[in-house]
């Protein structure tokens, strides 16, 4: 075979593999058992912020359909953005028909080693536990229950539009909060490319934030993202213009399914 034709075939096959990987739809997980409580009040105002770094949940698009995860689920922040479907089971406080609700992981429920894991230390490892907002809890059970047994499973996150990137940092340090992630909802690795640079690997800072120690001001920025769960990779080209600045959020056209 002609060498030029051979190389062209390899390029086409690589592009087909990339498209197939990025377009695959996340199928979720089987049902498992856990427990759930809630924190905050009816407004969910006490649940703004959190360990994932999303800030105001309304501004970042998550609202009050959110949950804090015990360390068994939080996975050092790599679970940030994952979506879970929960329903109350085997409790007189469950609503009739055991309706389900979907929540996004936005915070960590820290261990309380001063209490037993079956008596107040609900988030002590290795216990699998969800600490929901009160509005989310009231979708599935009477809030007076305090704690309920639940069935849960991972589901695909259904998002409108592309992944959003909130920028912080300075001229030599770019910190990016990744939000509105569809499909598996999570990120394992990221890389950034300026219009005058090659790909620069970013390190996991905390929660849903990634950082690069490089001077990128005055360059349009693209991102390469790989899901923690599926290992699928997508590219968000020209996600931010050359005029980008810290404190602003930019929405790309790319997302996981």
UniProtKB/Swiss-Prot annotation:
Claim: Protein biosynthesis is one of the keywords in the record: no
One GO term describing the cellular component: membrane
Domain Expansin-like EG45 residue range list: 49-162
Domain Expansin-like CBD span(s) in chain numbering: 172-252
UniProt cross-references to CDD domains, sorted A to Z: DPBB_EXPA_N
Gene3D superfamilies according to UniProt: Expansin, cellulose-binding-like domain (2.60.40.760), RlpA-like domain (2.40.40.10)
Main location: secreted
InterPro entries in the cross-refs: Expan_Lol_pI (IPR007118), Expansin (IPR002963), Expansin/allergen_DPBB_dom (IPR007112), Expansin_CBD (IPR007117), Expansin_CBD_sf (IPR036749), RlpA-like_DPBB (IPR009009), RlpA-like_sf (IPR036908)
Subcellular location, record wording: Secreted, Cell wall; Membrane
Leader sequence segment: 1-24
Pfam family of the protein (one): DPBB_1
SUPFAM superfamilies: Barwin-like endoglucanases, PHL pollen allergen
Membrane topology term: Peripheral membrane protein
GO annotation terms (biological process): anatomical structure morphogenesis; plant-type cell wall loosening
Keywords of this entry: Cell wall, Cell wall biogenesis/degradation, Membrane, Secreted, Signal
Sequence similarity: Belongs to the expansin family. Expansin A subfamily.
Function (record text): Causes loosening and extension of plant cell walls by disrupting non-covalent bonding between cellulose microfibrils and matrix glucans. No enzymatic activity has been found.
Name the record gives this protein: Expansin-A18
Organism this protein belongs to: Arabidopsis thaliana
């Amino acid at each position: 075979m002609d060498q030029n034709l051979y190389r062209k075939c390899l390029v086409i096959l690589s592009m087909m593999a990339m498209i197939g990987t990025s377009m695959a739809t996340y199928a979720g997980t089987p049902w498992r058992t856990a427990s759930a409580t809630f924190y905050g009040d009816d407004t969910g105002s006490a649940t703004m912020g959190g360990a994932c770094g999303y800030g105001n949940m309304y501004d970042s698009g998550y609202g009050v359909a959110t949950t804090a995860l015990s360390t068994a689920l939080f996975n050092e922040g790599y679970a940030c953005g994952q979506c879970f479907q929960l329903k109350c089971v085997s409790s007189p406080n469950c609503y009739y028909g055991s309706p389900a609700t979907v929540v996004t992981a936005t915070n960590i429920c820290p261990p309380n080693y001063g209490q037993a894991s079956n008596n107040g230390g609900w988030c002590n490892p290795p216990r699998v536990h969800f600490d929901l907002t009160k509005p989310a809890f009231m979708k599935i059970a009477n809030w007076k229950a305090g704690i309920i047994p639940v069935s849960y499973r991972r589901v695909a996150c259904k998002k409108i539009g592309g992944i959003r990137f909130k920028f912080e940092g300075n001229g030599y340090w770019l910190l990016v909060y990744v939000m509105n992630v569809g499909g598996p909802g999570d990120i394992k690795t990221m890389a950034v490319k300026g219009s005058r640079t090659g790909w620069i690997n970013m390190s996991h800072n905390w929660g849903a934030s990634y950082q690069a120690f490089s001077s990128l001001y005055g360059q349009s920025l693209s991102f390469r993202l790989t899901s923690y769960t599926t290992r699928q990779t997508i590219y968000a080209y020209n996600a931010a213009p050359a005029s980008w600045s810290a404190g602003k959020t930019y929405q790309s056209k790319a997302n996981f399914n």
